[in-house]
Amino acid sequence: MAGFVPLLLLLLPAGPTWGSKEKCLTKMYTTSGECCKACNLGEGVVQPCGVNQTVCEPCLDSVTYSDTVSATEPCKPCTQCVGLHSMSAPCVESDDAVCRCAYGYFQDELSGSCKECSICEVGFGLMFPCRDSQDTVCEECPEGTFSDEANFVDPCLPCTICEENEVMVKECTATSDAECRDLHPRWTTHTPSLAGSDSPEPITRDPFNTEGMATTLADIVTTVMGSSQPVVSRGTADNLIPVYCSILAAVVVGLVAYIAFKRWNSCKQNKQGANNRPVNQTPSPEGEKLHSDSGISVDSQSLHDQQPPNQSTQGPAPKGDGSLYASLPPSKQEEVEKLLSSSAEETWRQLAGELGYKEDLIDCFTREESPARALLADWSAKETATLDALLVALRKIQRGDIAESLYSESTATSPV
């Protein structure tokens, strides 16, 4: 028995046993009898096994991939999505890129190419969308739905249902929606059930006569005799809000235009008053005639010649005689205007304030070529435009020199 065991060992074959071969998944062996190693997912074979063991290397992201465990397969190149194909999943080490047809196209299973999605015509709506390898599936719009556009994305839409305060002017069809409009000028209210009545009956009421009146009521309340609960029927007054806003805007614009027109008209009248007055009028060579309140005309040049040579032009402060400023000769009025305008400070503005003018009207004079002339032209048209008033105003603004110039040559009395 002891000699039988060595004999049995000699009869066993050399190399790997049958049990070890059954455990070799690749079913490939090296020359030395070793089971060949397989490359995992994301790896490719660089050198297959033979004398040596299998050599693997990782695949390059977005360039190559390997989606199998193999002892012979190298990394495979990634698929490129071109033309009408777009990439839905990128290429990684263990998976290839996934391409699909672009929006509006589907992939034909027979040819593998992308074809344009079918369109549901008017009156037909989408049942199943167009995507991947499936074309658009359309259905005819059933009753109560419609489709008024031809496309491959919209299903049949439900028809519009008119409200209680609306009336249908066009019925809904498979190709067009229903059309409704408000009940006008009548509306219908329903009375609640009263004792002894079978069912409420609609009561049609005429609207109140609102000619010449603007109403802001949004609800119309009707009460029923024998019932303390009012029945409220919504009207169409909510739609009047844009109308009210438009009216308010028109009123504001009109008010602004009216104010602008009044200011423009005031400035225009002042300008016309200044232009109507003669500017360059000089006395005639024969002498200038002055008219006093007594109606006697005196030659001012002759009176000047008759004055004694030693009489001084300076004297007591001049006093007004109650005559109007408009009675002054044009040359004297022009002299006053020049004195008011030649001052370094705006003397004419101070004078205007003393004569009772407000700032807005004074600003109108500044737009004229000669503000002082426009001021005096406007003031001289008033009944209170006397020399006395002008003298008082000039003294208040410390311009007695202009007051003296008014009477230097303008007043003269004739001997009686």
UniProtKB/Swiss-Prot annotation:
Q: Which domain of life is it from?
A: Eukaryota
Q: Which residues lie on this side of the membrane: Cytoplasmic?
A: 262-416
* Annotated tissue distribution: Detected in embryonic dorsal root ganglion and retina.
**Cystine crosslinks:** C24-C35, C36-C49, C39-C56, C59-C75, C78-C91, C81-C99, C101-C114, C117-C130, C120-C138, C141-C156, C159-C172, C162-C180
**Main location class:** membrane
| Compositional bias per record (Polar residues), positions renumbered to this chain | 270-284, 294-315
Q: Does the keyword Cell membrane apply?
A: yes
Q: Which InterPro entries match?
A: DEATH-like_dom_sf, Death_dom, Neurotrophin_rcpt-DD, TNFR/NGFR_Cys_rich_reg, TNFR16_TM, TNFR_16, TNFRSF16_N
**Record keywords:** Apoptosis, Biological rhythms, Cell membrane, Cell projection, Developmental protein, Differentiation, Disulfide bond, Glycoprotein, Membrane, Neurogenesis, Phosphoprotein, Receptor, Repeat, Signal, Synapse, Transmembrane, Transmembrane helix
Functional note: Low affinity receptor which can bind to NGF, BDNF, NTF3, and NTF4. Forms a heterodimeric receptor with SORCS2 that binds the precursor forms of NGF, BDNF and NTF3 with high affinity, and has much lower affinity for mature NGF and BDNF. Plays an important role in differentiation and survival of specific neuronal populations during development. Can mediate cell survival as well as cell death of neural cells. Plays a role in the inactivation of RHOA.
Q: What is this protein called?
A: Tumor necrosis factor receptor superfamily member 16
**Which species?**
Gallus gallus
